[in-house]
Amino acid sequence: MMLAVTGCKVQLSAPAPGSSPGPAPSATSAPATSGPSTAAVAGPLVIEPAAGFSPVYRLIDHARHSIDVTMYEFSDGTAEHGLALAEARGVRVRVVLDKREESVNSGAYQYLTSHGVKVVWSWSKYQYTHQKTVVIDGAEAVIMTANLTRTYYPTSRDFLVVDSNPADVAAISAVFDADFAHAAVTPGDGTDLVWSPTDSQQKLLAVINGATSSLRIYSEEMGDTEVEDALIDAAKRGVDVQVCGENEDGEYNSAYSRLADAGVHISYYSSSTGFYIHGKVIEADYGTAHAKVFIGSENFSSTSLDRNRELGLIVSDPAVLSAIASTFAADFQRGQHVPSA
């Protein structure tokens, strides 16, 4: 499935010296960005931790009319200052922060509101507002697996995509307007969006169930039975399934053992102070004409898929696919592997 998406208007170059954290010692040598966008890409792919967050800061600094931010956790003084400066120069800045993470978000809430930025806590209709997006001028949306939380920048594997497809950005903006007002909305999917709690499980299962040769998956969490069953079914029908995830304190020992015993290849990391798999990615059938990749905020848990506000997208751009594949291969090799029965 080829998804026509237009490119980004602001060039995302390498971060300036000292402007953001450098790569963690275990970061791969994969390119920080995927290169020029094509007709099937949602803009440059930014790979963390190597790239840093200067690409996001620059987009904020270039905003002329509006900035809408939806963030699960927000604790980044540079981004906060950039939003305050934008408000001061006449840009309309609005922010939705997750209420359940108030202990993390209260500093940003207080700073931004004191500088005239309109900030609201998330609607209690959703268990968590786990979405991570920044919409610039109603024309571009940064869709992230990462939170704007500086503490985690040096060690977390995360991915950011800049989407300037008009249908996508319009749909994201419409949902933001509703969420900001605590109003009900049925999200539009635009060209290639994946929303929780409306259709994420259905769309992620479709990617997994449609795979014919390979699946490469980053997942911080594992706990949705339907997704696990789909991965097992894929392995049983001959798809090469590899999962790279987290397993701090053995939280997912049972799920990983079940998957490994069914033929799924598992590699994980388990230190909260070292390299951390925070990205949420499903790459299907890399190297084939029908390859595609999901990138977003959704974890493989029933809470994430069925009760949270989440956002991701599915694209088929060759440069994005290639960058994900090379990064995944290195991360998978370095992790701790789960033996099969």
Language-model features, listed with the residues they occupy:
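PLD/PLD-like phosphodiesterase catalytic module centered on the HKD motif
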Residues: 2, 6-22, 28-53, 78-141, ...
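Mature N-terminal segment immediately following signal peptide/propeptide cleavage
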Residues: 40-73
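Secondary-structure "cap/kink" motif recognition
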Residues: 52-53, 57-65, 200-214
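Hinge/beta->alpha junction and helix N-cap segments in small-molecule ligand-binding domains
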Residues: 196-198
